[in-house]
Regions:
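Mg2+-dependent endonuclease catalytic cores in nucleic-acid-processing enzymes, primarily RNase H-like
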Residues: 1-90, 134-146
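Charge-patterned, long linear interaction tracts outside catalytic cores
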Residues: 67-133
Length: 146
């Protein structure tokens, strides 16, 4: 049995209750993807947009590997980027409503990968010493989307 050393939970709607129930178990991060982006606010409309873009960059840089899962790969390829409707130059990933309008189900597995990358990067930022002390690595992180 492998226990995750960090878990990221989307705290919007259903995830909020899940987070409240499990946060006392250890390294659990609540993530509100509708908040402002943490980096480059001039480039992204919301944190969700930033996190999806960072995942895109990780694939381009070949710094991430995923399971050979047709459903996951399909979900990752379905979501589109565009510019925010405000007329700004900010990038925005296609929202859940827009996906539904296209007849596409919510990309739950892909969202989970996005959150796991967030957990990895956030944990790594704490410090190299902390990283080494806790022995965190990509394979030891879990992801859930409620």
């Amino acid at each position: 049995d492998r226990k995750p050393q960090a878990t990221a939970i989307d705290v919007i709607v259903l995830g909020s209750g899940v987070y409240d129930q499990v946060k006392h178990y250890g390294r659990v991060m609540g993530v509100n993807v509708s908040e402002k982006p943490s980096n480059r606010p001039e480039m992204f409309a919301r944190m969700r947009d930033e996190l999806w873009w960072k995942l895109r960059e990780a694939f381009q840089e070949r710094t991430i590997k995923i399971p050979n899962d047709d459903e996951l790969i399909g979900e990752l390829n379905l979501v589109k980027f565009n510019f925010a409707r405000t007329g700004s130059e900010k990038l925005k990933v296609e929202g859940k409503r827009e996906l539904r309008d296209r007849g596409v189900a919510s990309p739950n597995k892909a969202d989970a990968v996005v959150l796991s990358e967030y957990a990895i990067n956030r944990t790594a930022m704490r410090s190299y010493v902390d990283w080494r002390r806790h022995g965190l690595r990509r394979g030891s992180l879990s992801w859930k989307v409620a």
